[in-house]
Every structure is written in C-alpha cells, then in structure tokens.
Amino acid sequence: MNNVKILEVKQSIFASNDEQAAQLRQSLKEKKIFLLNLMSAPGSGKTTTLRSTIAALKDELRIGVMEADIDSDVDAKAIAAAGAKAIQLHTGGMCHLDAEMTRQGLEGLGPQDVDLVVLENVGNLVCPAEFDTGAVKNAMILSVPEGDDKPLKYPLMFQVCDVVLINKIDVLPYFDFDMDKCREYIAMRNPKAKVIPICAKTGEGIAEWADWLREQVKAWQA
C-alpha cells in the first residue's frame, strides 16, 4: 500500500488538555477501542517494534496505527505494508501530540472497526511525556545504545509509562549497558512499570510484549 493518508493535525488552544483526554478515553471505552501511546527517542526502533507487534497480533486483533512525525510518510507506509491500518500525522513542527490532535488522528483513521490503535508519538523524551493524549496506557522504548542512565536524566517519561521496552538487546555485548542498573533506575522512577527486554529485529521478547498488550486490550474491552 503506497498511498497513505496524511493528516495535518493542529494543537488545541482552548479546553483543558486533561479534560479532553478524559473525554477521549471515555469515548474509546464506549467503542471498546484500546489506544496505546508509544514514545521514545529517535532511532530507538519504534517502527520496527511496531511491525513485529503487528505480526504477532494481527490474526487476533484489528490494529490501527497513527504515525506522528514533523514531516514524511515513510513510517506509515512501512506499517501499512506490515498489515495494519495506518495514517500519518504531521505535527507542523510540534514535538508532541495532545488529546485534541490525537482525536483528529483517530477521526482521520476512518471507520473505527479496530480493537487496538497504537499512537507512535514524535521521537522525543521530553515533550510527549508532558501531554495526556487520551491513551489507555503509555509505553516507551529505550534502546541499549542510548545508555542505562536515561531514567535518571528523563524522569517524567519513565514516571508516566506503564511499560518500558528495552530494545536492541542483541547489541548488549558491545555497549556499556547494565541491565540490572537500568531496571533499578526505572523502579526508582516508577516501581509499577513493567520492564520487557526485546530485540525487535530478531523477535526476542516480542511474545512477552504481545502477551502483555493482548491482556490489556481484552481487559479494556471486557
């Protein structure tokens, strides 16, 4: 699928974002749609992780993906090719999405005959953590090359996330990355966050991640 719809989303300057986010979550609950907000730094492997996730779940769940970028539609095309319904969101220079922009994206995604929608937020460890998108759960990807001290440097990102995927574990032997320390740092920021080491490229750990996500979707739809 080469023709991916592109939507220019605009930031709301009116109602409280938190209020809009709560309203969006309620609407999603009524429609039995689970929205996951996926965040990370650029280059962490979000799109590759999404493709592996789609492959693991597409026979069980109807999946839609909203790809947020300042420009380009490369990621949305890759996701559509993987078998998910996809839309590209251009943020017009904004480094995050808020609830109104997310609502616009869901509307642009079309008929919402989906169980799971993944919002791939703009690659950034600061701004996206500050705005409630209306998602049911927040997830983030930390890649091994970024270092094990990111929870200390970007506390809010780890505080708002329900699950942390530690990606690119296949290169652990080549980087000074201490998995135990990283888990400890994450627990300092958010003791409730689930930590799942993965390699999106080889598929290691994807089954555990898919199991967690499947359970969350089913619980939301119950």
Where are these regions (language model features)?
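Nucleotide-state-sensitive switch-loop elements of NTP-binding domains
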Residues: N3-Q26, K31-M39, S44, T53-V136, ...
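Hydrophobic positions on the alpha1 helix immediately C-terminal to the Walker A/P-loop
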Residues: T49
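Secondary-structure boundary/capping positions in well-ordered alpha/beta enzyme cores
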Residues: E60-L61, Q112, V164, K192-A193, ...
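Active-site glycine-centered loops adjacent to acidic/histidine catalytic or metal-binding residues
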Residues: D69, N167, C199
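Residues at the C-termini of beta-strands that transition into short coil/loop
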Residues: H90, L142, C199
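Conserved C-terminal guanine-recognition region of P-loop GTPase G domains, centered on the G4
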Residues: P128-A135, V144-K192
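Canonical P-loop GTPase G-domain recognition
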Residues: V171-A222
